[in-house]
Amino acid sequence: MRSAGVLMPITSLPSPWGIGTLGRSAREFLDFLAESGQTYWQLLPIGPTGYGDSPYQPFSSYAGNPYLIDLDDLAKVGLLLPEEYQGIQWSTNPARVDYGLLYQKRFQVLKKAVDRLWANNKQAVQCFCDKESYWLEDYSLFMSLKSYFGGRPWKEWPEELRHRERESMSQAKAEMESDILFWKGVQFLFFEQWERLKSLAEAKGISIIGDIPIYVAEDSSDVWAHSDQFQMDADLHPTRVAGCPPDGFSADGQLWGNPLFNWEQMRADGYHWWLHRISFQFRFYDVLRIDHFRGFDAYYAIPASAETAKEGTWEAGPGLDFFRAVEKVVGQRPIIAEDLGFLTPSVHQLLKNTGYPGMKVLEFAFDSRDGGGRTYQPHNYPTNCVAYVGTHDNDTALGWISTASPEDVALAREYLHLDSIEGENWGMMRAIWSSTADYAIVQMQDLLGLSSEGRINTPSTLGGNWQWRALPG
């Protein structure tokens, strides 16, 4: 059965706290989806963000973002007093997230809530900590050490802590016990609010699509705690890093800088790290979008010393063997493959063998720089795909029309029969809604008729990304 949904980051929801949260605005958004006949709410990754604020570079593949914890909901359960958070200036612009301001002020408020949490609900919190110990022990110590060392990445910590020597680790845990309890308590609060929201979504018939980045940030508890799973030397420095080769959009390619997986080691231990990660994500989400699917067929490896991505080479990924292992653990759970970018016949074959739906982005259909644009035109869509006007990495529909080349826009207007009476953004959404694609997802900004001011992210740029927020009303 064909179905539709909306891509809306939680951070972009309106709220008085400088950023969207898991509270009232999220519940009201679920009401909107249900009342408008939608089936899916697609999110961006919801992990704790660091420098650059990208949800695709979180400090942990497991932890939730503390910024998303709703403060009013904490007050309702007696963990905060209104005067402890309501008089604080949380933002300077209601249409943008000020991450620097949140970093300065939010943790001071959460500290009060966590202190009360441990005092009043110790047994429940300890039970949570025991259940989540696989990742929570490392994450809470990682964040405590990071705070102690002034936010510096773990590769700049003392050698004995970088290498996780037993005696130094034990000493750090003892000396930082109060900080560790804080970070554990924050995760308890996040998970509690998330589970309530997820239950409400289920009751309203809304399925949540989560987003799992293929790579993890070097400065993360994942890499610090599981360095053997990555391509690193004896001093724990990456030997090769991730990125994309040069193409029509970037002459130098893209140098992402994430450490690459040691697929040989992962295959030898049955992909345990990955299988645990995916199983965990299905506790959060009904559907998983796996970012950079082509990297499982072949990945682009760039020497860590390289200045641009031009020096990289293609290396074989784990292929179908990996996805067969995933299926054995999670069963036939719904997975969306992000199959955009440079694709080869072997990538297409891997997608076919998995049976996962791929992605079709309408804005790519009219780009004169890409000879493969026709595959993104709706009359060429297979049924087993997810159709988008644009994703978080694209401009909004109206933004694309105002910034794309005149030739591309003219082609789109002719092909889609766009006009000002219907609204060109609505015409582009109509195209994917009326296509043969089984799933159609539109960005909230396109429903609101926003131009480039509503763009979430511009790849290969620093600053100004991940900040867009919807205004109340």
Per-range role (PLM):
Residues M1-T11, R27:
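N-terminal regions that are enriched for targeting/export leaders
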Residues R24-T49, F280-Y285, I432-S434:
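Catalytic domains of carbohydrate-active enzymes, especially glycoside hydrolases
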Residues W183-Y215:
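Conserved, well-ordered alpha-helix/loop/beta-strand core segments that scaffold catalytic motifs
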